[in-house]
Every structure is written in structure tokens, then in C-alpha cells.
Amino acid sequence: MSHTPHNRRHESERLSATIRFLGNLLGDVIREQAGEAAFQLVERLRTLGKELRNGAPDRADAELRMMAARMTVADIQIVIKAFNAYFLLVNLAEQMQRVWVLRDRERKYPDTPRPESIAAAIAELHACGIPATTIQEWLDTACIQPVFTAHPTEARRRTALEKVRRLATLLDERTGDLHGFVREENTMRIREEIVSLWQTDEVRVVKPTVIDEVKNGMFYFESGLFDLIPRLYRELEYALRTTYPTHEWRVPPLLRYGAWMGGDRDGNPNVTHTVTIQAVRMMRAAAIERHIAAVEELSHRLGQSVRQAPVSDELRESLAHDASLFPEVADMLARRNPYELYRQKCTYIREKLIRTLDYARTASLDWGRSDSPPKGAYFSRTDLLDDLHVMERSLLSNNAAIVANGALRDLIRQAEVFGLHTATLDIRQHSERHTAALAEVLAAAGVCADYTALNEIERIELLSREIENPRPLIPTRLDYSPDTVEVIATFRAVASILERLSPEAVETCIVSMTRGASDLLAPLLLAKEAGLFRPFRFSRLSMAPLFETGADLACCDEVLEACMRLPIYRNHLALRGFVQEVMIGYSDSNKDVGYAAANWAIYQAQRKLRDFGRRHGIQMRLFHGRGGAIGRGGGPANHAILAQPPGSIGNQIKITEQGEVIADRYGLPLLAHRHIEQVINAVLRAGLLQRDDPPDEWTQALERLAALSQRHYRALVYERSDFVPYFRNVTPIAEISRLNIGSRPASRRNTERIEDLRAIPWVFSWMQSRHTLPGWYGLGFALETFVYAGEQSDASGSAIDRLALLQEMYARWSFFRVMIDNAQMILGKADLHIASRYAELAPDQNAAAAIFAAIREEYQRASRMIRQVARIERLLDNAPVLQHSIQRRNPYIDPMSYLQIELLRRLRAAPDGPDHAAIEDAILLSISGLAAGLMNTG
């Protein structure tokens, strides 16, 4: 499928026209809402932003600084509001452009699979000789699970998301043949939405609660995902059927969704066991309400009469059983729909769902109670699916296959994927919290006076013994410290949820900072005490280690080997189907050792985990904890999947959908479809196409690059005493920590140490201050030293040979190419001139100048070396769409940075001044605007 320069020019012109149209409407709204003077101020700053890049930069810089210093806080707020609105509209225009390009290509090449689509993956598998039986075996146990997370720096509110969705629909209408009144009416509706946006608080006035974050996450399920999933399965079935026409395909529900909102309590004291229960109730209600609406619609469609077409005996028996559960409904149906048995069945399903919904909202989940769902209510997805399959089999056996494969089949797919719980909630907690809780419990029980003083071997022996001991360790009534009570109550809440409310609502306990086998045995003991684990009988909760520092990634297989030597852990794993989930943390590893070293540590860890699984015959399910920003493992998801080590994915994978990129990936239904199909495409190809491990020469080169990069990164971040003050003073980290952005604190502990700072605000702060340091620092030094000072990195050959080696790796090794391209992208979003203005916020200018000089030198080195390795003249020459997008945004981003710097200066100079609250509001607006403009947060 060719994409000619003519096509690209047409697409670029259409995008420019859309942005111009929206920008003109926004200008009119600014005049109308804020006045002509405000409009002229915005225009002057925008003009200076352009001159800063393309005209007289020194003069523009001086005037921008002078104007920022003289503006009132009220004027600054209006300007930032205008730029925020512009970025929202530009982002929407770019999203719609992607929609239109996809649609144009489908229209132009209807018989050619879209690149990176499901059909393209199946065609490639067929071309490579992969037999249908191999694909079927892969599908039978496949699990692809995107996991939605909240994000402390995601400032978009649900009300804004809904307005953007309406704007998207209106913009899409303009691609049709609109004339006269209809076109004018469309323009007025768009303007109406822009006015409404202008008059709406675009960021939160009060700090969001965890439940607010759950509601925000549910928006994407309710507004698109429920409807989207059946189409994706139809596309997969069609691709398989047409490419392998002789095989009878079974396509199980390989796609499932997960969530962290309400379950991730690591470092967030606001996520309590009661909040987790509330989140589960909300997600269960969302799924059930959606199924009720779907079954009502299905009832309208299934009006077949037994006088016209027979039904199965199985359906009649099912209806008789339903009538015994709902006699009043049965009487009503006998009068109203005596011959329409499918409608009768739909009515009973609806009644069961309503009863299930009532129970989900009101059921007591106190631990230790023996309540169960009322008669006629569904408990699991299987119960609902059993009823739906009864109708399906009856239709299939009575000449109505086309009906069975319509709306009913769609509802079956929705029930398979979303069940009665929408998404499976992960429970994440720091290993130290489990350790501290057990130390108190063991001491109180007289088992061990000081558990924390034990070495790893002693801990393992003690925990194994206690797990195997049938006597309760923890009494029913909890008389411990509040922290310990909360840890125990969390496991008890999970037990109550799984036993009495929703058996699929929670599946995994993720243990942050796992360092040894005892860190997995500790929650297993707590699970046993809550009734979630009975050796040799059942285990209802998987234990997933999270390896997130460079050192922990390096020994990840050793930790699991230690677990496998323990009979009690092997028994737990057997009860979980010999599936071992392991989460790999991209964020903290990057903060720990730097971008390049973290990428390589993660790659190596995956190879070790792959080999571990093969040695023990265990299905490994790797959970990739990627952030949206490059400094936290971000970038295109499908490219990242294909860049993983050969054989490391298999057919099971979990990937985080971080809060800050969910809106971009799932905000519009067609883009959500595109994102999910790209993920499925990548997992199919990575799991089924044979790939060899990279040559030793390449891996040896990466070993050297990683070591050099880590050394250079840590020399700046951890070994210079003046670095932490620089970071605290020249970025808005202090303000980000205080403002109403997310429910979670910015640090795990109340310290100034980089080690204790969460990775998200770490990356976010550098992005806001235009340094973007976590996404590239150390890489330039490593590349340059490897190529031009080979003797320092033990590399052989000449500089020309070593550069040629890196160029070959870039061309032929997807892992290395993705690593370089992601760094290139984040370098393209950096601006060291504006970063130098942030550096002026530091009280100690001599120390700040020294730090900034090191950062600038590394930026120049990284830019230069990446251009050489990728064989391009300018950064992003090989990504022109992104390059143009950045160029289009800079005239608006740059003035906002100047205004943010001025606001930070004023707030820090007079933290208790009369304008304190207004300045904080303006800073929050600027944070939101810069995040939208840069299209990266944390």
C-alpha cells in the first residue's frame, strides 16, 4: 500500500485547514468571552513564540520575559486558558486526521489489509507457513490484557472528555457533503462546544479521589470499548476464515481488560480496602447495566415465533427453570409473549441481571460472613454465558445461524471479555508493607519476636512453615496498628469479593520492590489467613513479583528459582494452572540507572524469565509496566511489543494503559480500534513468528552501551550533591506534589531523596521544564564513547567499524531501533534554551550553571550521535508527521513555558502572598496546558 508524496501533501493540507478552522473559531470565542485586549495579548505572545524559533530569537526572548513579568495573574490565566484550548483543539484535529487517513486508505485499497492490522498479521503468518493448527493452539490459551491505570498527572476531567467526543462527531460530519444551512448549523454547534469548554473548569478545583479516577477510567469502557470489542473479534474471525478457509476455527476470548484504579495502594494511603470494594462494585455495576441495555435491544430483535420456527428442547427446559425462579414474570410473559420464546428468555436474563445489579450494590462484604447471591442472580460470567449459549444453540439448530451470529453473538463476546465486572482489578502493594504487617502479627502471636531481623533463608523457612500450618495465625478481631490492620483487611476484602460478589473481579496481587522469595511468600501467607489459599485445595490469588530497579531486574530469575525450590510455592502455582505472572517496571528502573541501561536491563530480564519458564514448563505472563512518557517505557505499544526478546511473549501478555495516554488511545472509537488491533497484530507476530536471539556482537555492544550510559547517568543524578537542589528548584516538582492533580502522593516517603520520589512526577517535572532528561540522558555519552573512544569501552575495530555496527543494529534489530527512536522523539520535544530559563529559578546560579552545562553537553552529544546512527540530518527526519506536529505546537508551547517560569518565580518569592491561591491555580493550568501541548506528561 503506497503512501505517495501527493497523498501526504493532501493529508497535511487537510489537517492545516482543520486546525485553521478551529483556531479561527477559538479566536472568535476569546474575543467574545475575554475581550479584544485579551485576544491581542494572546496573538502577541503567539507571534513572539514564532519569532523565538524563526525570526529574531534574542529580541523575542527578551520581550517574552518582560511581558511575563508585567502581566497580572488574571491576564496570565486567560492566556494560558487560550493556549490550553488551542492544544485541546489541535490534539483533536490530529486525532481526527488519523481517523480520516485510515478511512481514506480503506476506501482506496479495500482488498488490502491495513498495515499493522489483525488481517495483516494473519496474512503474514500464512505467508510464513504457520499452519492453522499452530495458530489454533496459540489462540486456545492466549491472553492479551491491557490494564487501565490512573495517573497522578492526568489533568483532563471527564466533562472535558465528553465535550471532545462531541466535537469529534461534529468535525467528522464536516467531511460529508454539507452545504448552506446544514453546514452553518454544524459550525454553530462546534462553536457552542468551544464556548462551553471555555466556560468549564478544565482542571480539577479539588484534588480527585480514587473513586473519581475509577469513574474517569469507566468513561472509556462505557463510551466505546463495550461496542468496539465485538467488531474486533469479527475481524479476527473473518481474517482466519478467509486466509485458512479449510480450518474450523474456535476463537476464544483472548482479550481481557484489567484495572489499577482502586487496587493500586503502593504509596497511596487513599486506596483502602473499603475503596477497593467500592471500585469493584462500580465496575460490576457498569458491566451489568451495559448488559441490561444490550439484552433489551436483543429482545426487540428476537421476535421469532414458535408458530413460524421451532426452538430447541434445551431452550424450553431453560425457560421452565426460569419460570420457577420468577413466577410473576412467567405469568406476564404467558399473557404478552406466549409464542416468542427468545423474547421470554431475554426477559428472564434481564430480570436476573437486575437482581445481580441490586445485589452488587447492597451485598454485605464483611469478612467471614457466609452470604451468597440471591436465587436468580448471576454470580460469574459463566452463568450469564450459559443462558446466552442456550439461545445461540437453539437458533443455530433451527435455520437461524445468521441471527445467532448477529447481535446475540456480539453480546456473547461482550460477556466473555467484560464479564460481570468490566475489568479485573489488580491489588498492588509494596513488599515492605507486607513485611511490616507480618512482623507485628508474628510478634503478637509469639511466633517470632523480630521478623525483620531474620535473614532471607530464615524468613523463607518461617513463612513456609506458617503457610503449611492449618491453625489460624491472625485472629478474627484485629488488634494491631492501623497500617497492619489495613494490610490484613485488604486480603480479607479480596476474599469477600471473590467468594460472595464477583469471582473474576480480582486475580493478582502485585508485590512492588520484590527482592527475594520471602517477598512472595509474605502475601501468600496473608492470603492463606484470609481464606484465599488452602494448600492442595485452592488458590484464588496469583502472586506477581514486580522487579523495578536495575539490581532487581538482574536477579529476577534467581528469585523465581528460589520460589520453585519451595514445595508450598510450587503447590500454589499448580493450583493457579502453572501460570506465573511477573511485572517488569520500566519507570523506577529508568530513574535508577538511566534510559539506555534500564532498557537493556529489562530486555535481559525478559530473556532470563523466558528461559526460566522453559526450564520449569511454566507459562510466563509478563506484565509490562510501561508509562506514557519515554522516560517510563512509553512509545508506540505495538513497536514495543515487537522489540521484546524472541520467545518472551508467547501468547500471554499484560500491558499498562497509563492514564496520561488513555485519552489519546481510547478517546475516539476508531482510534481505540486502531490501537487494539495494532496490539493484537504485534502479539500474534511476536508469539508465532520464529525469531532468533540477536548476534553476540550486538548484545556485547549493548552491554557496553548500557554500562557507559549508567555510569554517566548516575554520576549526574546520584553522585553530585548539587543535583537534587537543582532538580527541586528548576522544575515544578514541589508544585506538582502540592496541586490537585492526582489522588496519589508524589513520593513514597516524606524525604528529598530521588530514590523515594515516584517515577511519574520525576519524569513529569523534567518534561514540564523542557529538559526531558529521563528519556535520553547518558545515551549520548555511551554512543560517543563506544564509537570514538573504543578503548574506554573495550570495543574492537575502528571508529568507522563501530559506527557501522550501530547503524546495522539500528536497521536490523527492532529493540535497538525502538530504543533509539524513542530517545530521538523525546529529544525532539526538549528545548534547552527554555530549559536554561527554568535553570534561572535556582538560588545558587553557579551550581545551576554547572549542572545545566552538563545537561546541555549531553543533549548535544545525544542529538549528534542519534543522527549518525539513524543516518538522518535532523532529529525526526524519519518521522515527518511527528516532526511537523512539534513544529506546529512550539509557538504556543514556548510562551506558556515563559509564563509558567514567571508564576513559579512569584509563588516561591511570596509563598504566603495575597495572590497565592490565584497563582497556584494558574500554575495548575500551565501544567495541564504544557502536558497537552507536549503530548507527554509522565
Curated annotation (Swiss-Prot):
A GO MF label: phosphoenolpyruvate carboxylase activity
Q: Which GO terms describe its cellular component?
A: cytosol
Q: Which key words are in the record?
A: Carbon dioxide fixation, Lyase, Magnesium
Lineage, top-rank taxon, reads: Bacteria
- State any GO BP term from the record: carbon fixation
Question: Which Pfam families does this chain map to?
Answer: PEPcase
| Cofactor list | Mg(2+)
Q: Which NCBIfam families match?
A: PRK00009.1
What is this protein's function?
Forms oxaloacetate, a four-carbon dicarboxylic acid source for the tricarboxylic acid cycle.
Q: What is this protein called?
A: Phosphoenolpyruvate carboxylase
